[in-house]
Amino acid sequence: PSTLSPAPCTLHKTRQDSPFRPGRRGGAIPAEENVIIPNIPDDKVEAILAEPLLKTYVPNPGPIMSGLVSCTGSQFCGLAIVETKANGVKLAKELEATMNIPNEVRMHWTGCPNTCGQVQVADVGFMGAMAKDAAGKPTPGVNVFLGGRIGHDSHLGEQITDKPVAIEGDLLPFVQNLLVEKFGASML
């Protein structure tokens, strides 16, 4: 059997020592808030991969999309300063389309300082804040955090921006440079 974990997700063969081995029931939603569907019979994998839902929640996401986490953002939260989900997905797609990124980079978005998106434990975290555009007008932006880790060598990431970076126009090149300098990425 195989295990499918969409949104962002990965499809892989189940090993004998896996907690998702045959005979085990149910799915799982791990801390990263992905969905894992275990025990898919091999003869059903292709049919499941053809499901319309998996056009949006792809089974083999790229190195940014696979580690993307977001709070609900301003779409559903009155405390959020910025829209997190749409901006996170847009940035992930732009980065993956313009860069060679050798390893997964966990990026977390949170719309406000309450940090429901847990930006301080991400490789790169984005906390919603108001920035200024090129004309000096207020625009949605983010404070950027770097270096958070969970697990054995856990520690909180640190804010690396002195002032918020405007999401439109400034954030993409800022993060591209960050990925080149800190994560071994290169431009395509």
Model features per residue range: what roles?
Residues P1, Q120-M187:
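Mobile "lid/hinge" segments at catalytic clefts and subdomain interfaces of large enzymes
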Residues S2-T139:
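Small-residue-enriched alpha-helical segments and adjacent helix-cap loops
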